[in-house]
Amino acid sequence: LVVLGMTGTGATILSELLAQDPANRPLMKWERLSCCPPPEAASFRSDPRIAKAVGEVEFQYEMVPELRAVHYEPGDGPTECVALLGQSFYSQDWLGLFRVPTFVDWYRHCDKGPAYEYHHLALQLLQSRTGGRWSAVTRCAGPTG
């Protein structure tokens, strides 16, 4: 199940709702922050990486308190797949972090196929020991993608 939504349309809350269905397998924030080794089914809810991710996210909210109200995404909850695309640098997230006109131009015209191939492989890796049906939520590329 893949859900696409423009920024600010509720895709994040939809990912939370889809994650409530035990048949769905969302990408978890802690997995995205630390993909390897892939999680084990037996320790999926108690993996030590969860506490680390929760701490990292809480630190981020301490540094920028307004962020919690604008985009709340707990370290032990689901996250958008756009984060995996960022690992291959084919993500619109990079456009908002730095002002690099040459990157913007490259991103607008590049072949994004390799990014989705990487995304597919990353999801396969993460699912290799846990199984389940993915419920992937991501933002649309918008005018720059």
Task: Tell me the role of every PLM-derived stretch.
Residues 25-34:
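Short beta-strand-centered segment that lines the nucleotide-binding/catalytic pocket of NTP-utilizing
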Residues 19-26, 124-127, 131, 144:
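Hydrophobic/aromatic-lined pockets within catalytic cores
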Residues 33-135:
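PAPS-dependent sulfation machinery
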Residues 138-145:
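ATP-dependent NMP and nucleoside kinases share a basic, alpha-helical "lid"
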Residues 3, 135-136:
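Conserved alpha/beta-hydrolase fold motif
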Residues 2-24:
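Glycine-rich phosphate-binding P-loop
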